[in-house]
């Protein structure tokens, strides 16, 4: 399927600010205001691809009992919550608070050791008991006298990236207890507030920089007979309709919490999302001749920027050394191109490819399929370029040098193998990146070259028939004079009419 994932992850609270907030909360704890506060922040990000496909990929990584995919008019909710807030079956209420986290090991033996470590850890058990007691008291407001019991205390559940400590609390209620009474007594879940609940919520309102929204609320199902089941929407993505999303994460702060450890725990909890392999590699292709690699630092700068955006590890010094070795000595006089492939885990490969004869003098073909200007992948050089490869092959078969694309608004974007410049009314123009295209290295050089005095401007397909010239640019071939093929020119004229 088509790639789907996230990029451009941004913390709503910087690490330094988070450490300050932990200190403030611990001052409240020392003063006796509370004994536990759940401190949270958000990861904001861009997403690409189909939300349902993203849900399926993440569900493979986060096998949970209380997940949900909800399509809304203005976005989607992708919940991968492992935590039960409250469930009703007849006259029985069940809550299953989750508090206590440990990372997974690399081997079964390491997993066993870490699982046991979490189960016996005094700090995690103390935090957990605080919330179990809080939930027992909340359920006690609804249950019959003596009707609350803890069935399973300090259970450890296994997930793909971590272990979690849970307990199961059961309360027997009268048949007359209604949903609104349950919500009034239990909401919000104590595991995401702290204890005592009301004072913890006041401190949260003072310290957290923005409302939590759905995160830490409740979502679930209602049955006609009055039964229901609600999760706590932790590990839950909220996606809008414009390619942006957020994920709330947090941890419990107590008097002996170490702020750096709590911040690391938050990052561990979000790793099911941030560690998702995007299903593609980053690419850089550059020309090499007797002098060396052309515009090497510009290529490595673009690779570094894309790696940062998509969360790839990238060691440019190692890649630079590898390129020097690939080039060898002496360099030789026949130009060739080097191709760099970088995967998310930082692994990279280099390939030396001979330059073909090219297709100078052949015209451009208008690609029949449009691109989406909002597709963030178009702004980065990746292996997720099936549409471009298909249209390039179609163009070559039909006797053209390349395929020229337009977006959903009828704006010219780029060719499958380079950027395009169009001369209109005596001035060279190239489409802005916002139209949905790669900011090519050669494109940036031409924009800075006084010989062209080129500018960025939206170019519509119907502008092409009156073009006084066209250039195709890429860092391997340089700047090529091209023209629109007769059939494609006729199509552009038809658009104009």
Descriptions of predicted regions:
Residues 1-282, 407:
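Extended alpha-helical targeting/anchoring segments
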């Amino acid at each position: 399927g088509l790639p789907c994932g996230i990029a451009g992850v941004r913390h709503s609270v910087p690490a330094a600010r988070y450490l300050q907030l932990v200190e403030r909360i611990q001052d409240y704890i020392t003063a006796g205001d509370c004994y536990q506060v759940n401190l949270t922040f958000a990861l904001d990000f861009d997403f690409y691809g189909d939300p349902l496909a993203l849900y399926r990929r993440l569900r493979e990584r986060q096998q949970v009992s209380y997940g949900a995919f909800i399509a809304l008019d203005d976005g989607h909710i992708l919940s991968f919550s492992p935590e039960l807030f409250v469930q009703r079956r007849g006259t029985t209420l069940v809550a299953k608070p989750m508090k206590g986290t440990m990372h997974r090991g690399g081997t079964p033996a390491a997993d066993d050791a870490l699982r046991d470590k979490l189960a016996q850890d005094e700090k995690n058990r103390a935090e957990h008991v605080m919330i179990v007691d809080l939930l027992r008291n909340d359920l006690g407001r609804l249950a019959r006298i003596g009707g609350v019991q803890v069935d399973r205390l300090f259970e450890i559940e296994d997930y793909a990236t971590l272990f979690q400590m849970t307990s199961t609390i059961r309360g027997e209620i009268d048949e007359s207890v209604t949903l609104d009474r349950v919500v009034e007594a239990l909401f919000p879940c104590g595991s995401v507030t702290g204890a005592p609940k009301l004072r913890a919520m006041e401190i949260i309102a003072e310290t957290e920089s923005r409302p939590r929204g759905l995160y830490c609320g409740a979502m679930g199902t209602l049955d006609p007979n009055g039964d229901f089941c609600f999760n706590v929407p932790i590990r839950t993505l909220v996606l809008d309709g414009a390619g942006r999303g957020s994920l709330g994460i947090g941890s419990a702060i107590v008097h002996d919490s170490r702020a750096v450890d709590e911040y690391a725990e938050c990052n561990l909890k979000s790793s099911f999302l941030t560690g998702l392999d995007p299903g593609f590699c980053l690419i850089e292709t550059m020309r090499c001749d007797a002098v060396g690699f052309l515009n090497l630092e510009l290529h490595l700068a673009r690779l570094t920027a894309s790696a940062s955006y998509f969360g790839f590890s990238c060691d440019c010094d190692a890649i630079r050394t590898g390129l020097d070795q690939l080039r060898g000595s002496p360099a030789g006089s026949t130009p060739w191109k080097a191709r760099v492939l970088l995967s998310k885990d930082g692994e990279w490969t280099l390939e030396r490819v001979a330059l073909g004869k090219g297709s100078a003098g052949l015209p451009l073909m208008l690609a029949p399929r449009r691109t989406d200007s909002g597709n963030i992948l178009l702004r980065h050089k990746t292996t997720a370029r099936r549409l471009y490869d298909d249209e390039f092959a179609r163009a070559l078969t039909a006797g053209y040098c390349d395929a020229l694309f337009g977006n959903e608004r009828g704006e010219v974007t780029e060719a499958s193998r380079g950027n395009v410049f169009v001369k209109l009314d005596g001035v060279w123009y190239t489409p802005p990146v916002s139209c949905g295209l790669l900011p090519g290295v050669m494109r940036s050089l031409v924009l800075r070259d006084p010989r062209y005095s080129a500018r960025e401007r939206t170019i519509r397909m119907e502008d092409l028939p009156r073009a006084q010239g066209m250039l195709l640019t890429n860092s391997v071939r340089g700047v090529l004079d091209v023209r629109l093929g007769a059939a494609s020119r006729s199509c552009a004229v038809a658009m104009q009419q």
